[in-house]
Curated annotation (Swiss-Prot):
Gene name tied to this protein: miaA
Top-level lineage group: Bacteria
Name of this chain's protein: tRNA dimethylallyltransferase
Annotated site location: Interaction with substrate tRNA: 106, 128
Assembly with partners or alone: Monomer.
Gene3D superfamilies: 1.10.20.140, P-loop containing nucleotide triphosphate hydrolases
Protein's organism: Chlorobium phaeobacteroides (strain DSM 266 / SMG 266 / 2430)
GO molecular function, one term: ATP binding
Substrates-to-products reaction catalysed: adenosine(37) in tRNA + dimethylallyl diphosphate = N(6)-dimethylallyladenosine(37) in tRNA + diphosphate
Cofactor(s) listed: Mg(2+)
């Protein structure tokens, strides 16, 4: 295999939250001179730190992590934005002679980057407000009938009472002049010319849940509540006008409910652990149904981490 061919092979390290993928990616990156593409839709926000298990400043100093600390809460950024930008950066890194790792567990980001996405226009606040007024004035059946006339195939997939997708479908038509059905046929494959080896970290469900619970306790000991208080004070009164899901992140939303006196502290912590476990289940379902993953046992100690690092490095370098 020629060096130019090797540069076309990259490794994606996936796994449910708390499975150890970040530590493995960091270990591999140090060995093969790689930069990391973080496929984490929450670590990209500067304001979210402890609750997102963001890499330490020392880790970020040693290895370049892309899409970490790059946006502020409220900055619009879609899975399509991520896939386009990540694809461009991956090519630039490979062109420079370095290796690339993808590491993360955000399903929408991974779906767009690894499986491709429809090139839909970004949300338009003014157009969406116009449709919202029309919805309130004439009702969802009126909008649904309009969509049925314009894009019957898309309308057939919708329940007219689920107004978010209904409004988005009409917004796309009015912004682009094309139906959603037409747009989805123009599927973009960001990494079609690059060989991506997808590896997933697997561990027994009871052990995963134990790690999730223990990590939640560690986050609290590291100041998660104090971080939530700062976010609550600065952003919570404006949640309705901030167009991001960042503030609905598990670990923060439960503490916001506590700070808003809608629940007690003990219940909030219980819910953080429960919701994180539920999130891990959804991630595993996605990995198994949507991606072709080579599953590996998650390392439980430094020796196993070292052995797995060596094995993964060989997948990329061929040595």
């Amino acid at each position: 295999m020629h060096d130019s061919d090797r540069q076309k092979t990259i490794l994606a390290i996936l796994g449910p939250t708390a499975s150890g993928k970040s530590a493995l990616a960091f270990s591999i990156a140090k060995e093969i001179n790689a930069e990391i593409i973080s496929a984490d839709s929450r670590q990209i926000y500067r304001e979210l730190n402890i609750g997102t298990a963001k890499p330490s400043q020392e880790t970020l100093r040693q290895i370049k992590h892309h899409f970490v600390n790059e946006l502020s809460i409220g900055d619009p950024f879609t899975a399509g934005n991520f896939a386009r930008e990540a694809s461009a950066r991956i090519r630039n890194i490979l062109h420079s002679g370095k290796n690339v790792l993808i590491a993360g567990g955000s399903t929408l980001y991974l779906e767009a980057l690894l499986n491709g996405f429809a090139d839909l226009p970004p949300a338009d606040t003014e157009k969406r407000q116009q449709l919202a007024i029309e919805l309130e004035t004439f009702g969802s059946k009126h909008l649904f009938e309009r969509l049925r006339q314009l894009d019957p195939l898309q309308a057939a997939t919708l329940d007219h009472t689920k107004t978010q997708r209904l409004v988005r479908s009409l917004e796309i038509i009015e912004l682009s002049g094309h139906t959603v059905t037409e747009m989805q046929k123009k599927h973009i494959q960001p990494l079609a010319d690059i060989n991506v080896i997808t590896c997933g970290l697997s561990l027994p469900r009871p052990l995963l849940y134990e790690k999730i619970n223990r990590r939640t306790d560690q986050m609290l000991a590291s100041g998660l509540l104090q971080e939530a208080v700062a976010l609550f004070t600065k952003y919570y009164p404006y949640c309705d006008v901030i167009t991001t899901n960042a503030l609905q992140t598990v670990g923060y939303q439960e503490l916001f409910a506590y700070l808003d006196e809608k629940t007690d502290f003990k219940t909030a912590i219980t819910l953080i652990k429960q919701h994180t476990r539920n999130y891990a289940k959804r991630q595993l379902t996605f990995f198994k149904n949507r991606l072709n993953v080579n599953w590996m046992d998650a390392p439980e100690n430094e020796h196993e981490l070292s052995m797995l690092t060596t094995s993964c490095c060989r997948m990329i370098t061929g040595n």
